[in-house]
């Protein structure tokens, strides 16, 4: 929004006050990243900006916390070298990828069903599907623990995958439903009139048009699973340790800059995934003929 050429004094004050306010909010949100990033390269075992570090002295900068994260031990380590960070990384990707695949499949099918005209109880079904986004996570985690305990799948990868699938499905439903808005059903009729069966119509006509929404929803589902800690604490065990759980345990048991190294990697991963989502959103708008602003 640009300031009008003939803006009054009050409009100018409101405009620049608006920019100042949101600039401060943005700084408040982004400032921790600028603290975590440099400290992850510090040689000090404490979360501090030493005089040598601020003077850019070579001995004050180090990659040892990244080596500790990768379980590459050395004699200069002042903390216990452990493989929990690598095990947590492997488990997080394992749980995240499988739960994302399941959530993407279920969410896409649900969105296609809800997009059909004259769908009965559409609002009720939609409310149930997106309820994991609305209900407080601690309540969802407690309910999952009680339900999974009766099924005997707590403290297992199966329980965590199912739990993260439930948390990720709403994101897929919402993004695919938004992509299907304005979808021309005449394309389906034209495909069927040319002799294509249901499966061929789906993969050759529908899927290419909704693919940006599907991938965006899948990325959001993966980020949700990768960054989730509350459900892991309820449903998982020591064997199912993930990166967020290891970071939480590290803050409680052993304050180590290795946590900052992992946080820096997670920030980089999040930026890459969100950039991909934005590129897919723009591609989807081009396919749907929406003018870029």
Task: Describe the function of each predicted region.
Residues 2-11, 94-129, 142, 146, ...:
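Transmembrane-helix boundary motif in ABC transporter permease subunits
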């Amino acid at each position: 929004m640009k300031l009008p050429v003939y803006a009054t004094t009050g409009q100018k004050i409101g405009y620049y006050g608006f920019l100042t306010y949101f600039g401060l909010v943005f700084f408040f949100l982004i400032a921790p990243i600028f603290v975590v990033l440099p400290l992850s390269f510090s040689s000090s075992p404490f979360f501090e900006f030493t005089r040598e570090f601020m003077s850019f002295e070579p001995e004050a900068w180090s990659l040892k916390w990244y080596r500790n994260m990768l379980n590459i031990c050395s004699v200069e380590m002042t903390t216990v070298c452990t493989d929990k960070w690598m095990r947590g990384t492997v488990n997080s990707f394992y749980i995240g990828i499988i739960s994302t695949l399941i959530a993407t499949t279920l969410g896409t099918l649900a969105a296609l069903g809800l997009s059909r005209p004259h769908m009965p109880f559409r609002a009720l079904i939609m409310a149930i599907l997106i309820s994991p986004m609305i209900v407080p996570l601690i309540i969802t985690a407690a309910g999952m623990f009680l339900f999974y305990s009766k099924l005997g799948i707590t403290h297992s990868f199966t329980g965590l995958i199912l739990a993260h699938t439930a948390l990720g499905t709403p994101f897929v439903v919402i993004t695919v439903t938004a992509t299907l808005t304005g979808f021309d059903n005449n394309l389906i009729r034209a495909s069927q009139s040319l002799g294509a069966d249901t499966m061929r119509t789906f993969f050759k006509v529908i899927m290419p048009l909704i693919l940006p929404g599907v991938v965006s929803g899948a990325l959001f589902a993966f980020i949700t699973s990768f960054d989730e800690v509350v459900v892991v604490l309820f449903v998982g065990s020591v064997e199912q340790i993930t990166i967020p759980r290891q970071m939480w345990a590290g803050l409680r048991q052993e304050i180590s800059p290795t946590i900052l190294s992992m946080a820096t990697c997670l920030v980089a991963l999040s930026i890459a995934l969100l950039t991909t989502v934005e590129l897919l959103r723009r591609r989807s708008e081009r396919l749907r003929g929406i003018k870029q602003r």
